[in-house]
Every structure is written in structure tokens, then in C-alpha cells.
């Protein structure tokens, strides 16, 4: 409203005696003028005071280099010869927004009635129509409404000609009312003119149409005046938001506009309790007591509780538990975003900040708290302007301004340490991350607040679990923040579970929505009879839903009485939230999962034939980790699989990822042949600063950060550059790795598998003694001999500090012919499955299977020749037949070998030779 009136008024005509004026233009008035000048809309004009039909005074208001009052006075002095009459000084500058709205509405009423003037009756209608001010409330309480008042006004003065001039003047009585309203404001000791003062001026004038309207409506002017003065007295605290210089009681209007009083919030009990942090609060108090440079700066990682220390200081001040140097002071947190917001013109930001500093200096009881203090640097800076930090520097050094800053270590280094002048004005106070025990105490201190918010209870075990599990599994955040978030989200989860509607109520609710849609459709079609029937049905269903909800509440209340206090957040709920955040199963092992873990070897052997030692080692490691017995500071396990090519080293890692972690994609696979050169090693942790790819992160570190619970396969480890092994030392020992950006990546929940072909030559030489033709004891002793030889060769290739950190070095056996036959069955099944998608049923004979095994068996190369044999003998033959259209969708195909050893592919209708056992026929 202020903006519209600012255009409609020719303000300088309302001002006189600029030498005597004590009132400077308010921010709101100036902003209104600027806005309206920019808009250039054709608003209402108001005349009646001398000199209103002159040049565009809004342009005068916009001239740079002058404050609001100077601009107004300049405009008045240029026309002093014509402005003979003495007019109330700076009147409209002191109108509140509600009073401005009243005048605007009065003009609208004049236009509505077709009158070329604004009289006392229009001001009365404006007072009633404004609706929210003291005047409107008093008139409403007297039974006066806008409709009746309009009728009375029209009875008394009738309607006008209909032609309304562009400029609507005030009648002499209306001008007298405005002058009397200013007088009433002065008598009440107010530095502003509100709607209540306009009403008092109207009553005091006592004559005119408005007085007759009030009389006709049965209102007693004396009674109205009494009510207005009473309400003004009651709301004395709430009228401080004024236009102009504001209420004399408010010494720090700028600070209140752009800051929040933490001490007041502490007195009202709105701040969370601060547990611990005594040394930091005492150090802050100590620094605040200094004569100069008394500005502590809290530095710590995000989430360790820097802001909580400022709140703790505010609580101590509120409780009087502080030394006399800061006793009775107010801690006010400054919103830098709000301070900068809206400063469109040069110098506005600096003006706000200087006002704020002046208020702090004059009050002498303000401690300013700036969260994210690094935002001072560059705030408000434009071409040729200076930023907030440079404006504040002199005051910070001389001790005129007590300021507590808070920022993170990175931001402090990046912004504040770069400016030594600013750095020396702040005294750093390090805020370390609390320990797990301290975090538990903090959670117990906050427990009551979260119980009230979520309407439930937390067990001690839940709080302890939140601290411990967040510390162990959430590595990229800091205590107590991550533990508090766990507690909060667990409370939200439990509350939502208990707040759900009963199933019957949900069904009824769906039906109600359907009925409402149908009812609206009938109403649109004006079929009100049907709509009425549906409305009755809707009401019945809603009553049923209410009854079901009430019944549920009664049942939960009964449960509450038996179980003390309703829903309870337990350790299980905290574990569930940790699992949902990280993907790491930390909840207790269920019966089904226990069975799965105990039978893990059998399941893996369905895919991995032979290699009992490796399968058992993997299974033991997973079981150990799942029940929580593994070392919490090391990876789940780290293995090196050594052996000849094609015996299942990589396949075992894939099988584990598919079985236990959900899919083969859950595995992070790094082919170490890609890291053969020295400069490629940096790809694991990310390029160093200044190199291409620095922002992308490392292939290994980024993958583990996104999926902390997984299998990491380093395939063909011996192909990597030796520098890779140096990098892996800290992963194997401490379960951590620092990437190129300095972030620590947690490997404590990963299973590390390295495959290697080192020692395959030794195995090949001794391989003839390891076979199915030997008895068990001979096989075992031969395996142990080969294992020791391979281990010796590994020691020659890898450095001892690398091998010493591995949990186990597992040597894979060469595959026997029987094992190759089992692998052939698995590979043939894969072909059957691929053909099944094309609706072709395939069977192979025993002779064909033996032929495949004979051609595919090679102890030195493992199972890979078998894959090539199947490709050549089966897949190639099938492909030719399918292209020749001899095999079509829906056919049943049998593959056999004739007496000459040639592969023959027969359609099922051509005759059935000896078929494969059922296991291999799909």
C-alpha cells in the first residue's frame, strides 16, 4: 500500500519547516518512492494541500546523494513562494502502512461514489474497510460494518456526477482530520501516525458527514475514543514496526530486522540444551572479556556443534551463569543473507551495515554471532564498493564490536587465512569432534526435545547404538550431527508406522474420494438430487472412518497404558536407518539369513566347481563380518587368489557378489592391466590439482564412497605398476585411503580380492601330480607342496610389507577332468537359457557332452578352452541351422555326435537319439 500511495501523493506539498524537521525518511518510504518511480503506473493523485499540481516530485525523490528528508525539503523550498499556508510537517512520511492503506481506500470510496473530493466520510469508510488496524477492530466491536456505513454515507451525500478528476483533493474538514491525527499521535507520545490516530482525529473533529454517519449507526464517539486508547495501550509493544524513525522504545530496529536474539530464545526455552563443550564456552567467554580484538572464531568440521556453543553462551547469559564482563548482554545472530537481500542500489548495503554497527556501539550490550563468518568476505562488494569484512575491520580491532564467528576449517583456510588483517582480528577457538561417549551424553540431553516432537520414547540402547553405529559406519560426516540425525529419522520412522490408518479405514477413504469426484461431476451437470444422495453417503463413510480411527486410538492408548508410554524407538530402529543410509546390513541376523550364511559354501559351489579352500575362506570372512566379530578398523577380509588361468579366481568374486550382495554389478572390478604405467596409478585416487580430471575423483575412491559395502576385485594384480601396491598398504591395514581432494574413504566394510597368475608355472610343472587319479592323501600333500612353492614365488614378486597385510594367500588347484565335466554342464545350461528366450528347446546327448569335455580339457588353461569348444561345436552349428531356417521358434532340438565324430543337429521331429540326463535338458 505504501508503494501505491507513494505514487499517488505529491509528498513535498505536505511538508513544511524543513529546518525544524527532526524526522529522516524511513527505508520503507524511500523504497516505496523508488519502486513507484520505476513502475510508472498511472495511480491515484491526491490534492488539496498547497502546491500539489507541480512537477514530478518522485523524480526529485530519486536524485542521488540526498536522504529522504533532504529531497522533500528541497522540493518544498523551490516552491516556498507558492506554499503560503503552514502544513503539518513530514506527515505522510510518518504514516504507517495501515494508515496509508486507509487513505488509499478513502480515495477508492470517493471514486466509487463519483465524488471529486475526499471528505471525512470517505476516511471513515477507509478506516472500516482497512480491516486489520486498531481503528477497524474498535469500529467492528461497536457493530459498525462497511455495508451499513456505505448506505448511510450515500443517504447523506448521495452520488456524484460520475466524472472524477485525476487529482482528488481533500475537503477542509478532511485536512483538519489529518492535522488532528498528527496532534493525537504527538499527545500519545507516538512517533508515527496509524489508523487509530486517524480515527481519534476524526472523532475529535466532531463535525461533518462522518460524525453524522456514526450517530446514525448508534455509535457513541466518547466510547469509541475510550476503546481506541485502551487498545493502543494494550498493543504498545506491537506497534514498534513503524514508518519513519520508529518507536523511541526500540533502540536497535536494524539489528532486530536482520538478526535473531538468541538470549531471548534461551529465556523462553526455545533453544536445545547444550551438553558438554565447557572448555570451548569458557575460552569464548575469556576472549569476549578482552579489551581489544575480543572476537572469538569457532573453527571445526561441519556438524561438530559450533553454533551450539553460541547457543550455550546465550543460555548461560540467560541463567546469569557468566562473569560480570558479559553479564546482561544479548547474543544476536546476524543473517547475512537478509542483510544483503534487496540492496539493489549503490550504497544501500553499506548504509544498512553502518546503521547496524552504530546501533551495536550505542547499545553496548550486544554480542554479535555470525554463522558462516567467511560470508563476510565479498558480501555486498560491487565495482568500486567495499565488502562487509573491510567495513567491520576497524570496529573489530578496537573492541567496539564484540563478534563471535563460526566457520569450517576449509572455509577458514580458504577465505579468512588469505586475509591476514581479518585473521588477526579473530581469535581462533578449535571445536573438536566429540567422542562416542560424549555424543551419548549429548543425545541423552536432547532426548526430551525429540520425544516431545515425535510423541514417543527413546530407549538408552537406541541412543548408544546411534552414537556407536554412526561412528562406525557413516564415515563422511561428523559426530554428534550424524548421530542426532539417526535419532531424529528413527523417531520419524516409528511415528509414521504407528500413525498409519487401519486397512479398513484406508479402503473407506478411497471410496470417499471416489464418491466426492462423482458428486462434483453431478453438481457440474446440475443433477442436484444425485449429488445430494452421494453427499449423504459421503457423510456416512466419513463417520465410519472417524469411528475406526477412534477405535485405533483407544487400542493404542490401551497399549500405551500397558507399555508405559506409547511408541518406543529401539536399537533395531536405529540399525534399520543405518542400513537404509549406507546399504550395510547392521541389524541382527535373522533366522533365514543364518541358514543362508551357514550354507554359503554349498550355494557358491553350484557356480564354482572345486576350489574348496577358496570358497571356505570367503564364506568364513563373510560370516565373521556379519555377526560383528571382525576387526572394526580393517576391511572385512583381504585375499590374494593365485593359480593358473581359467580355474575360477575372478568367477568366485562374481559369484560372491551375485549371491550375497545382490548382483554381479554390486562388485567394484578394477582390471589392473589398465594401471601398468606410473602415471595411470593416480586414476585410482584421482588426478592431482592442476591436472585434467581433478574434479572427477578416483575410480576406486569414488566407487567405494558411493557403495561402502561391497566386493572390490583387483583383477590380474601382478600386471599393475609397483606403485599401486604402495597405495594399497593403508587400505589393507587401516581400511582407509585418502583421495586427491584430501577426503578419507572408508574401506572397513569392503571385501578385497586380488587375483594373480604368479606361480602358475610352478603349478603347471607339478600339476601332473595333482589330479583325480591320486588318492586323497596324495592330493592333499601335493597341494601343500605346490602351495608353498607358489607362496615363495609370490614373496619374490611382491614386497613383504604388502603380503604381510593380507589375510590369506589362496592357491587355486588345477581343474581335473571330472570338474571340467561339471563346468561343461553349467556352460551348456547357459546356452539352453539363451535359446529358451527364442522359444527353442535344446537337448544334448551324453556323447556330445563327452566330446565337448575331451576337446575343452587342458590342465594348463583351465575352463576357458571349454568355452571355446562349446562355441565351436554347439553355438556355431546352431547358428547355421537357424539362419538356414531349419530350426525355428517353438522347435525342439537335439545335438549329437555321429560315429565319425561330427556334430549333428536334429530337429525333435526327426527322431530321438539317446538324450541328455534331465538336468541338462531345458
Curated annotation (Swiss-Prot):
InterPro entries: AAA+_ATPase (IPR003593), ATPase_AAA_core (IPR003959), Clp_ATPase_C (IPR019489), Clp_N_dom_sf (IPR036628), Clp_R_dom (IPR004176), ClpA/B (IPR001270), ClpA/B_CS1 (IPR018368), ClpA/B_CS2 (IPR028299). Residues 509-544 form the UVR domain. Residues 1-72 form a transit peptide. Residues 92-234 form the Clp R domain. PROSITE patterns: CLP_R, CLPAB_1, CLPAB_2, UVR. GO terms for cellular component: chloroplast. Its main location: plastid. It is found in: Plastid, Chloroplast. Keywords: ATP-binding, Chaperone, Chloroplast, Nucleotide-binding, Plastid, Repeat, Transit peptide. ATP binds at residues 300-307, 643-650. Belongs to the ClpA/ClpB family. ClpC subfamily. Molecular chaperone that may interact with a ClpP-like protease involved in degradation of denatured proteins in the chloroplast. This is Chaperone protein ClpC, chloroplastic. It comes from Pisum sativum.
Amino acid at each position: 500500500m505504501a508503494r501505491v500511495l507513494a505514487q499517488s501523493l505529491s509528498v513535498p506539498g505536505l511538508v513544511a519547516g524543513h529546518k525544524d524537521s527532526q524526522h529522516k525518511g524511513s527505508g520503507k518510504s524511500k523504497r516505496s518512492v523508488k519502486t513507484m518511480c520505476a513502475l510508472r503506473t498511472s495511480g491515484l493523485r491526491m490534492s488539496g494541500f498547497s502546491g500539489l499540481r507541480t512537477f514530478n516530485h518522485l523524480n526529485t525523490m530519486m536524485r542521488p546523494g540526498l536522504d529522504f528528508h533532504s529531497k522533500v525539503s528541497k522540493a518544498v523550498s523551490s516552491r516556498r513562494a507558492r506554499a503560503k499556508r503552514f502544513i503539518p510537517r513530514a506527515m505522510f512520511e510518518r504514516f504507517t502502512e495501515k494508515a496509508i492503506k486507509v487513505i488509499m481506500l478513502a480515495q477508492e470510496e470517493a471514486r466509487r461514489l463519483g465524488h471529486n473530493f475526499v471528505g471525512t466520510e470517505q476516511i471513515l469508510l477507509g478506516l472500516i474497510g482497512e480491516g486489520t488496524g486498531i481503528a477497524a477492530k474498535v469500529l467492528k466491536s461497536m457493530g459498525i460494518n462497511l455495508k451499513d456505513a456505505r448506505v448511510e454515507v450515500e443517504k447523506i451525500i448521495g452520488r456524484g456526477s460520475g466524472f472524477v478528476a485525476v487529482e482528488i483533493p481533500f475537503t477542509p474538514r478532511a485536512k483538519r482530520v489529518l492535522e488532528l491525527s498528527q496532534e493525537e499521535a504527538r499527545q500519545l507520545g507516538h512517533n508515527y501516525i496509524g489508523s487509530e490516530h486517524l480515527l481519534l482525529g476524526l472523532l475529535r473533529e466532531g463535525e461533518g458527514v462522518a460524525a453524522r454517519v456514526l450517530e446514525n449507526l448508534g455509535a457513541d464517539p466518547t466510547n469509541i475514543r475510550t476503546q481506541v486508547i485502551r487498545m493502543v495501550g494494550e498493543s504498545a509493544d506491537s506497534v514498534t514496526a513503524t514508518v519513519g524513525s520508529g518507536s523511541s522504545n526500540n533502540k536497535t530496529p536494524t539489528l532486530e530486522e536482520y538478526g535473531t536474539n538468541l538470549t531471548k530464545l534461551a529465556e523462553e526455552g526455545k533453544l536445545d540444551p547444550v551438553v558438554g563443550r565447557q572448555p570451548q564456552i569458557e575460552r569464548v567467554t575469556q576472549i569476549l572479556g578482552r579489551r581489544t580484538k575480543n572476537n572469538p572464531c569457532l573453527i571445526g568440521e561441519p556438524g561438530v556443534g559450533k553454533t551450539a556453543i553460541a547457543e550455550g553462551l546465550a543460555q548461560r547469559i540467560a541463567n546469569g551463569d557468566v562473569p560480570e564482563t558479559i553479564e546482561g548482554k544479548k547474543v544476536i545472530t546476524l543473517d547475512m543473507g537478509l542483510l544483503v537481500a534487496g540492496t539493489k542500489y549503490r550504497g544501500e548495503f553499506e548504509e544498512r551495515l553502518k546503521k547496524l554497527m552504530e546501533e551495536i556501539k550505542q547499545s553496548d550490550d550486544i554480542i554479535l554471532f555470525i554463522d558462516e563468518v567467511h560470508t563476510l568476505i565479498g558480501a555486498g562488494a560491487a565495482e568500486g564498493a567495499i565488502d562487509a569484512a573491510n567495513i567491520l575491520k576497524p570496529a573489530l580491532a578496537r573492541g567496539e564490536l564484540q563478534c563471535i564467528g563460526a566457520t569450517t576449517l576449509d572455509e577458514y583456510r580458504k577465505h579468512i587465512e588469505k586475509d591476514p588483517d581479518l585473521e588477526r582480528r579473530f581469535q581462533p577457538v578449535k571445536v573438536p569432534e566429540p567422542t562416542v561417549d560424549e555424543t551419548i551424553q549429548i543425545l541423552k540431553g536432547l532426548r526430551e526435545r525429540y520425544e516431545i516432537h515425535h510423541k514417543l520414547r527413546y530407549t538408552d540402547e537406541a541412543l548408544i547404538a546411534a552414537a556407536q553405529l554412526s561412528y562406525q559406519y557413516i564415515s563422511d560426516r561428523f559426530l554428534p550431527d550424524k548421530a542426532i540425525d539417526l535419532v531424529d529419522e528413527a523417531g520419524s520412522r516409528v511415528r509414521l508406522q504407528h500413525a498409519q490408518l487401519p486397512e479398513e479405514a484406508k479402503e473407506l477413504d478411497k471410496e470417499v474420494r471416489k464418491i466426492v469426484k462423482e458428486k462434483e461431476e453431478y453438481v457440474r451437470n446440475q443433477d442436484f438430487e444425485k449429488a445430494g444422495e452421494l453427499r449423504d453417503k459421503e457423510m456416512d463413510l466419513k463417520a465410519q472412518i472417524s469411528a475406526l480411527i477412534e477405535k485405533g486410538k483407544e487400542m493404542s492408548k490401551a497399549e500405551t497404558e500397558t507399555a508405559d508410554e506409547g511408541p518406543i524407538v529401539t536399537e533395531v530402529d536405529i540399525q534399520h536407518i543405518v542400513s537404509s543410509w549406507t546399504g550395510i546390513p547392521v541389524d541382527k541376523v535373522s533366522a533365514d539369513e543364518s541358514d543362508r550364511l551357514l550354507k554359503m559354501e554349498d550355494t557358491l559351489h553350484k557356480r564354482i566347481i572345486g576350489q574348496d579352500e577358496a570358497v571356505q575362506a570367503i564364506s568364513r570372512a563373510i560370516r565373521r563380518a556379519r555377526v560383528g566379530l571382525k576387526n572394526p578398523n580393517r576391511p572385512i577380509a583381504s585375499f590374494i587368489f593365485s593359480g593358473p588361468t581359467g580355474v575360477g579366481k575372478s568367477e568366485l568374486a562374481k559369484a560372491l557378489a551375485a549371491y550375497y550382495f545382490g548382483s554381479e554389478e554390486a562388485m567394484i572390478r578394477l582390471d589392473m592391466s589398465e594401471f601398468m604405467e606410473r602415471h595411470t596409478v593416480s586414476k585410482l585416487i584421482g588426478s592431482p590439482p592442476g591436472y585434467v580430471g581433478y574434479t572427477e575423483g578416483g575410480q576406486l575412491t569414488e566407487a567405494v564412497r558411493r557403495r561402502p559395502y561391497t566386493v572390490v576385485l583387483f583383477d590380474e594384480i601382478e600386471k599393475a605398476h609397483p606403485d599401486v601396491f604402495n597405495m594399497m598398504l593403508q587400505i589393507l591395514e587401516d581400511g582407509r585411503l585418502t583421495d586427491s581432494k584430501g577426503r578419507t574413504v572408508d574401506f572397513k566394510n569392503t571385501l578385497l580380492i586380488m587375483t594373480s597368475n604368479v606361480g602358475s608355472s610352478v603349478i603347471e610343472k607339478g600339476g601332473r601330480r595333482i589330479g583325480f587319479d591320486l588318492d586323497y592323501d596324495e592330493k592333499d600333500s601335493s597341494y601343500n607342496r605346490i602351495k608353498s612353492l607358489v607362496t615363495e614365488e609370490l614373496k619374490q614378486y611382491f614386497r613383504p610389507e604388502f603380503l604381510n597385510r593380507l589375510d590369506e594367500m589362496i592357491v587355486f588347484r588345477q581343474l581335473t577332468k571330472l570338474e571340467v565335466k561339471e563346468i561343461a554342464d553349467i556352460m551348456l545350461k547357459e546356452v539352453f537359457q539363451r535359446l529358451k528366450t527364442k522359444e527353442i528347446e535344446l537337448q544334448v546327448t551324453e556323447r556330445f557332452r563327452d566330446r565337448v569335455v575331451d576337446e575343452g580339457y587342458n590342465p594348463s588353461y583351465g575352463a576357458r578352452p571349454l568355452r571355446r569348444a562349446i562355441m565351436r561345436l554347439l553355438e556355431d552349428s546352431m547358428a547355421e541351422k537357424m539362419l538356414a531356417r531349419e530350426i525355428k521358434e517353438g522347435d525342439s532340438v537335439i545335438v549329437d555326435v555321429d560315429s565319425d565324430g561330427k556334430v549333428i543337429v536334429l530337429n525333435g521331429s526327426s527322431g530321438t537319439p539317446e538324450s541328455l540326463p534331465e538336468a541338462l535338458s531345458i
